[in-house]
Amino acid sequence: MPLEAAATQSMSKQHKAFLRKLYLAHLMDDERHNLLSLNKLTGMPRRTLQDSIAAFEDIGIRVEFVQDGNRNNAGYYRIVTWGPISSAWVDTHVDEIAAIIGVNASSETLA
């Protein structure tokens, strides 16, 4: 089912959670992000971000936190592999995904 058709129908929580993971993985693959920058960029609550990132493995995406400094939380997330997911497909549909999950995709750069 195309994303446009899915967006017009009622979408399950699971489907939105799946799309949220794809969107976050896209952001992490494009730039270096930590929880704070993802929170500012997406407006998603910190706990939602943590839960989504922790569940990446459920859909085959492997992510790691790269320590960048002395503090434990100083660093960024890096996508190790997209697994069975086509990152090119996500890149092509990122605006649609963002609209469905309620995020403004045009604000993908931090000021």
Predicted feature locations:
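Residue-level detection of the helix-turn-helix DNA-binding "recognition helix"
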Residues: 53-58
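Helix-turn-helix/homeodomain-like alpha-helical modules used for DNA recognition
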Residues: 81-111
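Pre-recognition alpha-helix immediately N-terminal to the DNA-recognition helix
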Residues: 19-26
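Key DNA-contact positions within bacterial/archaeal DNA-binding proteins
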Residues: 47-50
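Short capping segments at the starts of secondary-structure elements
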Residues: 30-34
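The alpha-helix within a helix-turn-helix
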Residues: 38-40
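Short Lys/Arg-enriched helix C-cap and helix-to-coil transition segments
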Residues: 61-76
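Short, Lys/Arg-enriched N-terminal segment that forms or immediately precedes the first helix
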Residues: 1-13
